[in-house]
Regions:
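ATP-binding N-lobe of GHMP and related small-molecule kinases
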Residues: 1-100, 118, 122
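Acidic/histidine-rich catalytic neighborhood of metal-dependent amide-processing enzymes
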Residues: 134, 145-146
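Generic structural marker for isolated residues within well-ordered, non-membrane alpha-helices
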Residues: 28, 72, 113, 129-130
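A cytosolic small-molecule/anion-sensing beta-strand core signal
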Residues: 9, 144-145
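Short, well-structured alpha-helical segments that form the helix of a local strand-helix-strand
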Residues: 125-136
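DPxDG-like acidic metal-binding loop motif
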Residues: 68, 100-126, 142-144
Length: 146
């Protein structure tokens, strides 16, 4: 079975830096809005283990440097399935520009987490998916919840 997800970009309507965490990241207060500008993410399972990622843009990484790949790895490391962990095939059709502040990578990661939750019948809550997503990128929880 294959699931195709649309992964919408987001914009920051406001962004206020309120401090800095001990790890160097900024504390922020922001208002975000999802927009109708999407990547397309196809996810399917196969018997053989491992993650295979392809991306329509050959300049983008198709390995553990990619947030879609890291999301799948984080999901598989967290999920408690009765059967052996499946292999995962992911294809990302990129439309959202990279490094444009539109959360394209985070949107792709959120789509992968949501699709894997459905495909594996893991029955994780949105909160649980957000916890996994937070380990992949700061904007992933917003992209899960919209």
């Amino acid at each position: 079975m294959e699931i195709t997800m649309l992964a919408p970009a987001k914009i920051n309507l406001t962004l206020d830096i309120t401090g800095r965490r001990e790890d160097g990241y900024h504390l922020i207060h922001t208002i975000m809005q999802a927009v109708d500008y999407t990547d397309e993410v196809r996810v399917s399972l196969r018997e053989a283990g491992g993650i295979r990622l392809t991306v329509s843009d050959p300049t983008l990484p198709a390995d553990a440097r990619n947030t879609a790949y890291r999301a799948a790895a984080a999901f598989l490391a967290t999920v408690d399935l009765e059967e052996a962990l499946p292999g995962v095939d992911i294809h990302v059709t990129k439309r959202i520009p990279m490094e444009a502040g539109l959360a394209g990578g985070s949107a792709d990661a959120a789509a992968v987490l949501t699709a894997l939750n459905w495909l594996t019948d893991a029955h994780m809550t949105a909160e649980e998916l957000c916890e996994i997503g937070q380990t992949v990128g700061a904007d992933v929880p917003f992209c899960i919840l919209g």
